[in-house]
């Protein structure tokens, strides 16, 4: 998506002069180097340092603080967001967002049912084991019962000196 950015400038007036902003990925890279993540930027945790970094990347290295104080943070952030939206490619109206499953916590009911009901292990075993132990136990059980094929083993040989 970021490779299809347009090179359009967003212009706004500040203190009698016209400022031209163009969205640039280097601003985000510089912010990440300073410990400010992309998600923090668009969640609203905007600080003066973030705005100044955007202005520096936009070609205003000498006076970002003056622009920030002249306009105010919220107003400047509105202009920066407009510049980002102007640069992003237009979304295809035929593509519809399909709500996916919440990638939150794992569904432990299914896993507990697999371990406790199918493998007939006590519930204490399930809750006291790590995920790795549970997967290893399930694989051993499935191979023994014939649900899975036994993985093929490969042996590596040192071919040096065998000639």
Regions from the PLM with identified roles:
Residues 1-163:
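Charged interaction scaffolds used for protein-protein
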């Amino acid at each position: 998506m970021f490779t299809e950015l347009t090179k359009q400038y967003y212009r706004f007036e500040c203190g009698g002069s016209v400022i031209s902003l163009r969205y640039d990925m280097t601003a985000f890279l510089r912010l990440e180097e300073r410990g400010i993540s992309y998600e923090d930027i668009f969640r609203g945790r905007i600080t003066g340092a973030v705005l100044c970094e955007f202005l520096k990347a936009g070609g205003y290295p000498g006076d970002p603080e003056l622009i920030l104080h002249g306009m105010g943070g919220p107003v400047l952030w509105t202009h920066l967001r407009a510049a980002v939206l102007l640069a992003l490619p237009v979304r295809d109206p035929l593509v519809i967002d399909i709500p996916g499953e919440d990638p939150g916590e794992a569904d432990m009911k299914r896993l507990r049912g697999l371990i406790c009901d199918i493998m007939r292990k006590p519930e204490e075993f399930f809750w006291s084991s790590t995920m790795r132990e549970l997967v290893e136990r399930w694989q051993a059980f499935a191979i023994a019962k014939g649900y899975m094929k036994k993985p093929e083993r490969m042996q590596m040989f040192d071919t040096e000196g065998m000639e």
